[in-house]
């Protein structure tokens, strides 16, 4: 793992930072950054952070982890399996099952740290990892509080497209194309990618606002990172069918612990968070809509991300 500071955000003087790794139950080694309040003593409440989907720990998840450490938590940001500095072959693949396990493995790791109070662990998922975080929390009662920030329901988008405008015939055609690709790539190895974000100088201005906003983050100095899937060639195309036959939060009634969903008022993805929130049960579920914020504003805009409210949520439920 790279030891020098190579994040897209500035290092805080209020926290200590170290690189660590931990394994999931599939035997994959995950790379992580630990952020801890300076001069902290005793066992702390801890939070594991991942996302956005297609990003690495040097991007938004690291920023969130560092901001939470500034507010008194031990926080880790990790690279999912098959991406960044984590292990797994082939590279730049995803799996709802394995990625849900990645969050649970982070809880395994935190639960065994001597400076963490094992019954005071929460998680944060950003973008597509917001949905995966809820999936993990529904499966794992050790996760006492979950934040899904600017969340995507990736299986919903994968199966029906943005704003549910896709059709079953379109989905079947995509499956046929990927099935043919699988036959070909069985002998050649995985080669074809879905494509990352569009370079800024190739944008025409006619793209949807959210497409331009993704490029403004992933393809500029603001958020570009050399190990980020979205900043470069994108995911392996074969993986895409994984979203078409799965769902997140199959049993929302099992998610008994606290949940906070955070979305931007102007986020194209807002409907996913609001619809998911409607499925949740109990008075320990909260929804925050950030005035004027877009989807990617909640990646890194410190004046838009409600870190103090997120910290207050964790302080309340990680007692």
What residue spans do the PLM features occupy?
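Alpha/beta-hydrolase active-site loop
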Residues: 93-114
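Alpha/beta-hydrolase-fold enzymes
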Residues: 134-219
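Short beta-strand/loop motif that positions the catalytic acidic residue
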Residues: 255, 261-263
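The serine-hydrolase catalytic nucleophile loop
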Residues: 54-66, 80
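Short beta-strand element of the alpha/beta-hydrolase
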Residues: 43-52
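N-terminal cap/lid segment of alpha/beta-hydrolase-fold proteins
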Residues: 2-42
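Conserved alpha/beta-hydrolase
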Residues: 67-87
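Catalytic histidine-centered segment of alpha/beta-hydrolase-like enzymes
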Residues: 293-304
């Amino acid at each position: 793992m790279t030891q020098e500071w190579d994040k897209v955000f500035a290092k805080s003087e209020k926290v200590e930072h170290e690189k660590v790794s931990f394994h999931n139950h599939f035997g994959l080694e995950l790379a992580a950054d630990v952020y801890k309040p300076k001069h902290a003593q005793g066992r702390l409440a801890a939070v594991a952070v991942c996302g956005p989907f297609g990003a690495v720990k040097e991007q938004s998840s690291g920023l969130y982890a560092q901001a939470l450490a500034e507010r008194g938590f031990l926080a880790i940001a990790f690279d999912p399996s098959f991406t960044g500095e984590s292990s797994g072959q082939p590279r730049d693949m995803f799996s709802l099952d394995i990625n849900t396990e990645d969050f649970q493995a982070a809880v395994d790791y935190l639960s065994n740290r001597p400076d963490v109070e094992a019954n005071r662990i929460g998680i944060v998922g950003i973008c597509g990892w917001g949905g995966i975080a809820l999936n993990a929390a529904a499966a794992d009662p050790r996760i006492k509080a979950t934040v899904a920030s600017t969340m995507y329901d990736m299986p919903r988008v994968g199966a029906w497209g943005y704003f549910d405008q896709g059709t079953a015939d379109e989905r079947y055609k995509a499956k046929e194309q990927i099935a043919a690709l699988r036959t070909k790539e069985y002998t050649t190895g995985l080669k074809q990618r879905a494509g990352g974000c569009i370079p800024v100088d190739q944008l025409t201005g006619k793209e949807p606002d959210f497409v331009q906003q993704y490029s403004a983050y992933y393809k500029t100095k603001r958020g570009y990172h050399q190990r980020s899937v979205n900043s470069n060639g994108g995911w392996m195309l074969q993986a895409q069918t994984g979203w078409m036959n799965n769902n997140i939060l199959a049993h929302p009634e099992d998610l008994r612990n606290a949940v906070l969903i955070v979305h931007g008022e102007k986020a194209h993805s807002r409907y996913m968070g609001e619809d998911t929130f409607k499925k949740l049960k109990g008075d320990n579920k909260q929804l925050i809509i950030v005035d004027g914020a877009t989807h990617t504003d909640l990646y890194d805009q410190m004046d838009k991300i409600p870190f103090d409210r997120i910290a207050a949520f964790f302080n309340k439920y990680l007692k």
